[in-house]
Design a protein with these regions (language model features):
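Short beta-strand elements that form the blades of beta-propeller/WD-repeat-like
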Residues: 1-6, 35-41, 70-76
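Repeated scaffold domains used in trafficking and secretory/extracellular systems
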Residues: 24-36, 59-71
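An edge-strand/N-cap motif at the start of beta-rich repeat modules
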Residues: 1-19
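A short beta-strand motif characteristic of beta-propeller blades
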Residues: 17-24, 52-59, 89-93
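Loop/turn residues immediately N-terminal
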Residues: 8-11, 43-46, 78-81
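Blade-level signature of beta-propeller repeat domains, shared across WD40, Kelch, NHL, RCC1
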Residues: 78-93
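Extended, compositionally simple hydrophobic/Ser/Thr-rich segments
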Residues: 37, 46-47, 72, 81
Length: 93
């Protein structure tokens, strides 16, 4: 089971309670589904990581994000939610 937390602006990934790796910079929040990790930077961009490697970045004005499979839900600064599938904006609500 993988979990993530943000410490000193970097994502720390834990596996079975042990620190596995750290990655990213200027990170304010992060979430994982066990496979993919999404992180929100201080500039409001969403970064998507797989096994600690950056896959893609997208969005703007992000405050927090959640991930499930290939779908990422991003809460923006203006209170809206943007849904991305494979890095492409699907809908906003």
């Amino acid at each position: 089971m993988r979990t993530v937390k943000v410490s000193s602006g970097r994502v720390e990934e834990y596996e079975n309670g042990s620190l596995r790796r750290t990655f990213g910079s200027n990170i304010v929040s992060a979430a994982t589904d066990g496979q993919t990790t999404v992180a929100v930077t201080s500039s409001g961009r969403v970064e998507e990581y797989v096994n600690g490697s950056l896959r893609r970045t997208y969005g703007s004005n992000a405050r927090s994000a959640q991930v499930s499979g290939d779908t990422v839900a991003v809460q923006t600064a203006n209170g809206r939610t943007e849904e991305y599938v494979n890095g492409s904006l699907r809908r906003t609500y």
